[in-house]
């Protein structure tokens, strides 16, 4: 239960904090992610990046580390979701091809959107919902049942 309140409090802080503090927090969280990630996981990530992108080992390691550093920014962005509305989400997300969703939705058969687990994909669901489309996301339950109470 404590974790739930800590996350909610952190979310509130990130919602009221000035941009410079949010950027600092994101940088610190990203740095912690780099240091806290086990070496074997970083090596596996770099190997996968190297294979998929065809880059050399040094570049793959650089991309893996940059991805972890970006994680801090993503956490701060997610903590600010309570502030999102249809008007301001367009400053964060550039929507292209919404007409295809509209066309599929008008067929009244439902629409399934599959996405990869990269970047701040949580913004996709928020963006679509704020454009008036009903959303249902399928995710794994959190290990901490109280954290499952937090809806993004």
Predicted regions and their residues:
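Membrane-interface alpha-helices at helix entry/exit sites of multi-pass transporters
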Residues: 59-63
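Short internal beta-strands
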Residues: 137-142
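Conserved small/polar residues in nucleotide/adenosyl-binding loops
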Residues: 150-152
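A transmembrane-helix-recognition feature enriched in membrane-embedded lipid enzymes
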Residues: 1-47, 51, 66-86
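A short, well-structured juxtamembrane/interface segment
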Residues: 82-111, 119
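Histidine-anchored nucleotide/phosphate-binding helix
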Residues: 120-130
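Active-site pocket-lining segments that scaffold enzyme catalytic pockets across diverse folds
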Residues: 116
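Short, flexible loop segments at boundaries between secondary-structure elements
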Residues: 145-146
């Amino acid at each position: 239960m404590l974790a739930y309140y800590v996350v909610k409090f952190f979310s509130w802080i990130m919602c009221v904090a000035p941009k410079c503090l949010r950027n600092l927090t994101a940088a610190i969280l990203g740095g912690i992610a780099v240091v806290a990630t086990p070496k074997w996981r970083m090596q596996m990530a770099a190997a996968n990046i190297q294979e998929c992108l065809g880059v050399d080992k040094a570049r793959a390691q650089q991309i893996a580390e940059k991805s972890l550093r970006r994680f801090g920014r993503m956490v701060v962005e997610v903590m600010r979701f309570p502030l999102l509305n249809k008007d301001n989400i367009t400053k964060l997300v550039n929507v292209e091809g919404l007409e295809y969703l509209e066309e599929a939705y008008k067929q009244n058969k439902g629409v399934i959107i599959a996405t990869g687990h990269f970047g701040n994909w949580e913004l996709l669901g928020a963006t679509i919902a704020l454009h008036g489309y009903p959303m249902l996301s399928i995710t794994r339950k959190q290990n901490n049942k109280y954290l499952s109470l937090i809806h993004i």
